[in-house]
């Protein structure tokens, strides 16, 4: 019998407890419950309620076999979190990591539980979303300001230039197209043909979150207390993170399509950093391309996308026309 509840991916409490008791300090731990946290769309992420343990709650993240950000390496995420501990970016502490798949069927992490709410989707609570936006922009800027070499994050890979980083990101998305059943999709191939030979203007390399969507930023009131989901972290052009957020703002209806310089997040980010973001049309197109591939990936793996293919067609077509 499987140790995983197949429909949800949630492991049986007894199996988690058995593993926990192998850890120093958790020898008498009891698992009172394992509950799926439903906001994540890649790693299986659960809240574990504990008694007779150093903490009363923790987060369990289990590496998936397949998904929209494949290939996965959750132990890499653990290393990112350990290197970010003590920096200006608040992240959950790593309580333990496990590479042996015999326990829960795949490698996994046990993380500190941060009792805080993530930013809401703008269509669900625009007032709170707008109130959190300045702190959110400042948080993304603070990630990009980290001295990633001093923090020991060069293990993430160091492209020879920001332009090479951009190309590598496009190629990584293209490698998923066959598995996602969209290798022959005309619009995505047109985007790939346009993006691959394009060289963005010079820009510094920075630590990029890789998936800076608002659901990964935790707030108490309007104070940021945690940044989670670092599976896609990389050293690249920081405009990559901004391009994702501009693209998501269009898909969620938080900002109308227009010059990126008029996007509220771009303006707040620029105010926080004192830098002007150039060539954002290119980075918007690159992320609309990726989100088009993600759309097909979700379909393949049985998740109904929250945005439509018609939206992708409209936005990506307009974006490519600007290049």
Stretches with model-predicted labels:
Residues 239-274, 287-304:
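Active-site activation/catalytic loop segments of kinase-like enzymes and analogous catalytic loops
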Residues 228-233:
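Activation of the activation-loop gatekeeper triad in protein kinase-fold domains
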Residues 205-207, 225:
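Conserved protein kinase catalytic-loop anchor
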Residues 207-209, 214:
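Catalytic-loop of the protein kinase fold
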Residues 1-27:
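Juxta-kinase regulatory segment immediately upstream of eukaryotic protein kinase catalytic domains
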Residues 295-323:
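Helical subdomain adjoining the active site within ATP-dependent kinase catalytic cores
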Residues 35-187, 200-204:
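ATP-binding pocket architecture of kinase catalytic cores
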């Amino acid at each position: 019998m499987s140790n995983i509840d197949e429909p949800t991916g949630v492991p049986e409490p007894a199996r988690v407890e058995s593993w926990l008791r192998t850890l120093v300090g958790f020898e008498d731990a009891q698992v009172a419950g394992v509950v799926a946290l439903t906001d994540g769309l890649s790693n299986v992420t659960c809240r574990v309620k504990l008694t007779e343990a150093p903490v009363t709650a923790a987060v369990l993240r289990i590496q998936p076999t397949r998904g929209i950000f494949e290939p996965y390496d959750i132990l890499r995420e653990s290393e990112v979190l350990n290197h970010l501990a003590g920096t200006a970016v608040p992240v959950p502490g790593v309580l333990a990591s496990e590479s042996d798949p015999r326990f829960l069927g795949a490698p996994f992490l046990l993380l500190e539980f941060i009792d805080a709410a993530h930013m809401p989707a703008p269509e669900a609570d625009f007032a709170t979303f707008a109130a959190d936006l300045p702190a959110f922009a400042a948080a993304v800027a603070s990630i990009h300001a980290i001295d990633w070499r001093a923090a020991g994050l060069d293990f993430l890979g160091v492209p020879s230039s920001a332009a090479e980083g951009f190309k590598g990101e496009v190629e990584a998305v293209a490698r998923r197209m066959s598995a996602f059943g969209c290798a022959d999709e005309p619009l995505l191939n047109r985007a790939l043909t346009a993006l691959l030979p394009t060289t963005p203007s010079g820009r510094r390399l920075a630590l990029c979150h890789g998936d800076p969507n608002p659901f990964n930023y935790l707030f108490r009131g309007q104070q940021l207390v945690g940044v989670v989901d670092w599976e896609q972290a990389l050293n690249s052009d920081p405009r990559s993170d901004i391009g994702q957020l501009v693209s998501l703002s269009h898909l969620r209806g938080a900002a109308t399509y227009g010059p990126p310089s008029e996007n509220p997040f771009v303006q707040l980010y620029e105010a926080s950093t004192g830098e002007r973001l150039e060539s954002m049309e290119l980075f918007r197109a690159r992320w609309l391309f990726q989100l088009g591939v993600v759309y097909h990936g979700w379909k393949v793996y049985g998740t109904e996308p929250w945005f439509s293919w018609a939206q992708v067609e409209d936005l990506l077509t307009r974006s490519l026309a600007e290049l």
